[in-house]
Amino acid sequence: MSPFSIVLIGFAMSTDAFAAAIGKGAAMRKPQWRDALRAGLIFGCIEAITPVIGWVLGRAASSYLSAYDHWIAFVLLGALGTHMMIAGLRNGPDDANDAEAKTPKRHGLLGLATTGFATSIDAMAVGVSLAFLDVHIGVVAVVVGLCTFSMVTAGVMLGRALGNLIGKRAEILGGLILVIVGSVILYEHLGAAT
């Protein structure tokens, strides 16, 4: 497999994470570069590990994973997105004097890791297919991790810009994006199955 193909795989596998990162960045209150880099590192590490896991599991797990990966991603992203939308609705209308609105909001490690895992389940299935190609899985994992790191970091900062434009309702937008990403994953897999 050519280096160009590996980089294309890396960016293709990071698109779901990028979309989720835009949602996370929009939901955060003024995320700083360190927040974006932290999210990028968490997503990048998870996205790098999952194809290796898939590669190790090999052909035996392929049919099991491909049968359920889209449902797992849909449920995880749907639940996280719904939770974010409900939290955004409970926050009430924007208030310039609201002390909470001035306090930066960070997403916890568990929330970022769960979202990172949900957006990387497909990468595990790709890893299974890579087990049958002439490719060094370590190189692929590093490239995928770096691509995801850069895409998620950029996504969080892009989400910040969107969040500043729409205020506290950004959490609703972020949750909606996660639900849409999960729904698209489900739709793509169900559409491919027919």
Curated annotation (Swiss-Prot):
Keyword flag Glycoprotein: no
A Pfam cross-reference name: Mntp
Main localization category: membrane
GO cellular component: plasma membrane
Cited InterPro entries: Mntp/YtaF (IPR003810), Put_MntP (IPR022929)
Keywords: Cell inner membrane, Cell membrane, Ion transport, Manganese, Membrane, Transmembrane, Transmembrane helix, Transport
GO MF terms held by the record: manganese ion transmembrane transporter activity
Location in the cell: Cell inner membrane
Membrane topology: Multi-pass membrane protein
Annotated transmembrane regions: 3-23, 37-57, 69-89, 110-132, 147-167, 172-192
Keyword Membrane: yes
Membership in a protein family: Belongs to the MntP (TC 9.B.29) family.
Function: Probably functions as a manganese efflux pump.
Protein name, entry field: Putative manganese efflux pump MntP
